[in-house]
Amino acid sequence: ASYAIEGGGSRNYLHTKQMMYSDPASWHKLMDKFARVITGYLRRQIQAGAQAVQLFDSWVGCLSAGDYAEYVKPHVQLIFDGLKHEGVPLIHFGTGTTAILRQLREAGGDVIGIDWRIHLDEAWTMVGHDRAVQGNLDPLVLFAPLHEIERRVEDILRRAGNRPGHIFNLGHGILPTTPVDH
C-alpha cells in the first residue's frame, strides 16, 4: 500500500502512517481491496503454472509489532487464507522483520523469508522448525571477494543445521550492478 499512498518509495512513510493513524477506516478499506486483488492475482499465477508464489513486503519492517498486528496482519492473513488450498508453497517475505517474525508466521505462509539482519538459526527458532525458511544472505555480500562470499554462505548453511526446509537465497533482492560472476 505504501507505494500507492506515497507515490513511490519513501524514507519515513509519512503519508502511509498518517493514513493508518488518522483514518483507520479508509486504511482498512484500502488494505482489504489490495488483499482481494493480490489474492486473485496470485491465484491466477498459480493457475497459469506457478509452482510457488511469494508475498514480498519490502516496507513492513518499518512498522512496530503493534502496528503490524493492527494494520497489516489481518489483511495478510486474508491473502494466505485465500490461497492455502491452491496446492503450491506460499512464501511470506518482508525486510527488517526481526521484531515481527512470529507474527509473520501467524499471518500465514508455508515458507517464511528471512533477511540478513538476524542469524538464520535464531530466526528459524522464532518462526518454528515446522515451517520452512528462505534466505538469508545479505545481497551486498555479493560485491565482496569470493572468499568472503564463501565464508558467509558456509555460516548460513552451518546455522541451518542440516535441517530440511531451508531454501538458500538472498535476504532481499539482487542489485542490478551485482557482479555476474558472484
Language model features by range: what are they?
Residues A1-H182:
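Active-site loop segments of alpha/beta catalytic cores
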